[in-house]
């Protein structure tokens, strides 16, 4: 079996050494070279032809974003960003995903050996996924036209969306065309803590609806999208006649917290046939069982098609389980969601 060839770009010699040790400890991948800055990396890419690049966000001579933009324009390849956990870097990381990076990991606290095995497995999983991923299509920078289906504001109907690898840009593509009169949306995107607030704030600037990081106990309102906080589960709940957000630190489900299954199951319970469920690009099976529960509760369910997915894992599993009404290309999902809500199809059992 051929190994996945990886090239690391990081100005820290310690991080280059750590990444090399991690990659080479897995029998299905190898670190072919490591570069201290993008200008050195440019020559090493030509020499070693890596399949996956790990790229530091902040570096001398040329920063990670500038290099990524040039790389995706001149020699597109799967890139996993490596970022320190700061507010500034979380915003840069979100921008990197817009430019075409497949995924990202946070830098570990060097010198702390506890948890390094889990960190090694996390990096290896992201490398394997990136090696198989379809490079994402860039979403247009300008705002798309508002959709023609403009449903009346409704506090009963809502949309639940789940995504993983490639999901940040897929979610952006789904939310940007939505009018302010859209029903409420609850969204679980697999993401570590420290990044979801920047993700929500960036979407809020780009969208006509209000997008925010979800807060425990807040009322679910039409025209709003609520993003699950990193490392915390998002659920729908009821408070009298109103929907409410529930955020909690329950155990990981399908190895994930937040978990798409946790969200979808709560929506099946409390919204039933008043909901539309959407499963987007991502590795694994998180969300498949929950979407089936939504389907059985009367919700209308959609899956992103393989051709438009970065990774067709989660949608494939949901389709295989029989919980999907329609399989739709990414750029058609917004229209289909609102069409179903407007026509009342989401209310049919």
UniProtKB/Swiss-Prot annotation:
Keyword Cytoplasm: yes
Catalytic activity: [protein]-L-glutamate 5-O-methyl ester + H2O = L-glutamyl-[protein] + methanol + H(+); L-glutaminyl-[protein] + H2O = L-glutamyl-[protein] + NH4(+)
Any one Pfam family match given in the protein's UniProt record, by short name: Response_reg
Origin: domain of life: Bacteria
PROSITE patterns for the chain: CHEB, RESPONSE_REGULATORY
Places the protein is found: Cytoplasm
Entry-linked SMART domains: REC
InterPro entries: CheB-like, CheB_C, CheY-like_superfamily, Sig_transdc_resp-reg_Me-estase, Sig_transdc_resp-reg_receiver
One CC-aspect GO term: cytoplasm
CDD domains per UniProt: CheB_Rec, REC_CheB-like
GO molecular function: phosphorelay response regulator activity; protein-glutamate methylesterase activity; protein-glutamine glutaminase activity
GO BP term (any one): chemotaxis
PTM sites of type 4-aspartylphosphate: 56
Residue span(s) of domain Response regulatory: 5-122
Keywords noted in UniProt: Chemotaxis, Cytoplasm, Hydrolase, Phosphoprotein
Active site: 164, 190, 286
Domain remarks: Contains a C-terminal catalytic domain, and an N-terminal region which modulates catalytic activity.
Protein name: Protein-glutamate methylesterase/protein-glutamine glutaminase
Organism of this sequence: Yersinia pseudotuberculosis serotype I (strain IP32953)
């Amino acid at each position: 079996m051929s190994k996945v060839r990886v090239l690391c770009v990081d100005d820290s010699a310690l991080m280059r050494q750590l990444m090399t040790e991690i990659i080479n400890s897995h029998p299905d991948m190898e670190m072919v070279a490591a570069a201290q800055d993008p200008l050195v990396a440019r020559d090493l890419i030509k020499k070693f032809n890596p399949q996956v690049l790990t790229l530091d966000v902040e570096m001398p001579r040329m920063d990670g974003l500038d290099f990524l933009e040039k790389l995706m324009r001149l020699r597109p390849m799967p890139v996993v960003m490596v970022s320190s956990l700061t507010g500034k870097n979380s915003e840069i990381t979100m921008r990197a995903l817009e430019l075409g990076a497949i995924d990202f990991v946070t830098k570990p606290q060097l010198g702390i050996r506890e948890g390094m095995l889990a960190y090694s497995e996390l990096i290896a999983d992201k490398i394997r996924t990136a090696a198989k991923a379809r490079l994402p299509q860039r979403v247009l920078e300008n705002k798309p036209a508002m959709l023609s289906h403009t449903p009346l504001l409704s506090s009963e109907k809502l949309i639940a969306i789940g995504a993983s690898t490639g999901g940040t840009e897929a979610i952006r593509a789904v939310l940007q065309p939505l009018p302010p009169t859209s029903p409420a949306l609850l969204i679980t995107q697999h993401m570590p803590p420290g990044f979801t607030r920047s993700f929500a704030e960036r979407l809020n600037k780009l969208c006509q609806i209000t997008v925010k990081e979800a807060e425990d106990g807040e009322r679910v309102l039409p025209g709003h999208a609520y993003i699950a906080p990193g490392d915390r589960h998002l659920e729908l709940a009821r408070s009298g006649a109103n929907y409410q957000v529930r955020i909690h630190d329950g155990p990981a489900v399908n190895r994930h917290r937040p978990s798409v299954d946790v969200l979808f199951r709560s929506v099946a319970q409390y919204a039933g046939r008043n909901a539309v469920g959407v499963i987007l690009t991502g590795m694994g099976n998180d969300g498949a069982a929950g979407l089936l529960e939504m389907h059985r509760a009367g919700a209308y369910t959609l899956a992103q098609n393989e051709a438009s997915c970065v990774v067709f894992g989660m949608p494939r599993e949901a389709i295989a389980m029989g919980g999907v009404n329609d399989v739709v290309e990414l750029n058609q999902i917004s229209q289909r969601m609102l069409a179903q809500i407007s026509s009342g199809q989401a209310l049919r059992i």
